[in-house]
Amino acid sequence: MVSSPDYNPNILNRSEFDIPLAESSLDEAPFFNRAISGSYPPASTIKPFIGLLGLEEKIIDASTIIEDVGFFQLKEDGRRYRGWKEDGHGKVNLEKAIVESSDVFFYELSSKLTIDRISSFLAKFGFGETTGIELLTETESILPTRNWKLGNIGETWFVGDTINIGIGQGYITSTPLQLAVSLSAIANRGIIYKPTLVTQDYGQESNQKTFASVKIKNQSHWEVIEKSMISVINSWNGTAHNLYKEGGTVIA
């Protein structure tokens, strides 16, 4: 668990060291543990969850094609939501949408899913909650709902809000640790392990506690999403292909 920027731990050994004073005087707040206290938009890392929900709700299947022309236009008001790639990604199925991070694919999908289903599904993976790690400064992230927006912003929910959530922007936030724990559930086929601090490696004797277990209707959907995530690195057109190493460990 890493937080950057770091600091020299030796300065904490000095009896006269004043941590609050140092925090206020040092640039970029190195004593702020971003891994558990920083709350940020999850951005495109939310897309595998939205894709999985789309499969589960039968809004799409693995072969569904959406034409990504660089923007998605709302029928209600004609407003255009642009993707990061100006000229679009062309014909896109779910795997390509995750591999190339097509915003337009997930704009359209999330608009059909609605915020109610999205929020309920993400909550199962721990979004909007702390992980329960044994550290006092862990921040609870935001999983917005219609009632959350009405109570905190004083406005009703709009379809445009849902579209933003579909690409991990807007009101939704997560801590780096919470996001890592949630994403690990895809590799673990729905099992979410509670992160914990350890003093040594207990090997096979370790009795790691589960935080929750996400049940889905079709188990093959785990493989569809995991394969797409792996291809983000292993495929030449993946947005993280620069991390690929020949013969190295496959990661997603």
Sequence positions of predicted segments:
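Beta-lactam-recognizing serine transpeptidase/beta-lactamase-like catalytic domain environment
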Residues: 1-44, 49-252
